Amino acid sequence: MDPEAVELEKRHVHSVYENTAPYFTDLQSKAWPRVRQFLQDQKPGSLVADIGCGTGKYLKVNSQVHTLGCDYCGPLVEIARNRGCEVMVCDNLNLPFRDQGFDAIISIGVIHHFSTKERRIRAIKEMARVLAPGGQLMIYVWAMEQKNRRFEKQDVLVPWNRALCSRLLSESHQSWGHHCEHPRSRGFQGPGSVCGCAVCFKGRCDSKRSHSMDYGSAVARTCCEAISKEGERENGLYSNFGKSFRSWFFSRSLDESTLRKQIERVRPMKIPEAWANSTVSQQPSRHPSLDLHAPEPFSTKGPNLDEVFVDTSSQRHLGWLRTPGTSDNFSGHKGGGSRRKEGGNFLDITDTGDSVAASNSSDPSARKILRRVSAFDSNDSNSEDSSFLEAQRDATDSKAFMRYYHVFREGELSSLLQESVSELQVLSSGNDHGNWCIIAEKKRSWD
């Protein structure tokens, strides 16, 4: 047992998803094309497991196979169960399945949440254990090498954006013709919504969307400063990140990219002067919630995030790497060995007894967002100062919703399997919109 890793994952993975799960109740997102294709390629009657299924997005892609989902997060499992999926709560490090029981397994956006190399290996080995010989395993993880964003370390914290979720919930309700009298998720109240209905919140702040983005900028700015100072008091919990604080705002995950789809374009923001004066190395936000369409700082304009949802035949820019003599599951060029091995970075953590704020009707951040929006109804010349003070008070809550990720270098995931999980053979690997993906097959006894 590695208590530091367990505590880190508890605070910055499990607690975050448990408290943000209500935001996913009414959100509908599309299956990623490559994952969908992998599931549809399975033989009829196959038994498929989705380890880390979340709300069950991939459990009904192929009606010709039997799919079982499991996730560590109980609230997400409950959402999937309410959607008619066969799901259960379990731990990826100790799967409650017999050996060699599944014909195929998918692990989408899970392995990068394990905070040590040993735990990542254990998670993959456990999936290999329950995979039948000849069965295939698909794994997606965040990539360190991304076209329009940069990570300076492999172990990073990424802020969860509740305001963005609330906006999409609002737009989803409106597009379905729902109003306040329609049922809402248990225990969920959208930020700034007096009655708890996301539509009401949208109606009040539709004309102030750009102001709400300014609010997000202030939160991002003060969040870094407050966390940096508190990290010093916590014996360096966050001090090991250094410049990796900058990478909070240069990242995108599978779930966050789905939230971007329906958001309207808003004006770019100016770079706040306080960014340059902060003691923590920071840069303007590239997180989807904070700066949606500012010019890309590191490259020319890249593909829109919506392109991940187009038909796979149109994804010409997707380059897949194949190991010699493997199947033709993906088209692409050959090559792509391991550039360098894992750096072994890990975060020192000290338990301060902080509790994660739950997303309920008494959520203080909800009232603060409402007050911030209301401030623009007046001609108060000090509205910007008040927003800064509000953001400072929100800094602690923002820290509570920071998610941990280990971002993988090119070739690192393949090397991890080849060196530490000998029962698996990598068939193909590639980069899919900022994520490394591999497909591996479990070796037969005579291989």
Curated annotation (Swiss-Prot):
One of its GO terms (molecular function) is tRNA methyltransferase activity. InterPro entries: AlkB_tRNA_MeTrf/Diox (IPR051422), Methyltransf_11 (IPR013216), SAM-dependent_MTases_sf (IPR029063). Keywords: Methyltransferase, Phosphoprotein, S-adenosyl-L-methionine, Transferase, tRNA processing. The modification Phosphoserine is found at S212. GO terms for biological process: methylation; tRNA modification. Residues 274-306, 320-348 are annotated as: Disordered. Residues 276-286 have a biased composition (Polar residues). It comes from the Eukaryota. Its EC number is 2.1.1.-. Belongs to the methyltransferase superfamily. May modify wobble uridines in specific arginine and glutamic acid tRNAs. Acts as a tumor suppressor by promoting the expression of LIN9. This is Probable tRNA methyltransferase 9B. It comes from Mus musculus. The lineage of its organism: Eukaryota, Metazoa, Chordata, Craniata, Vertebrata. The gene is Trmt9b.
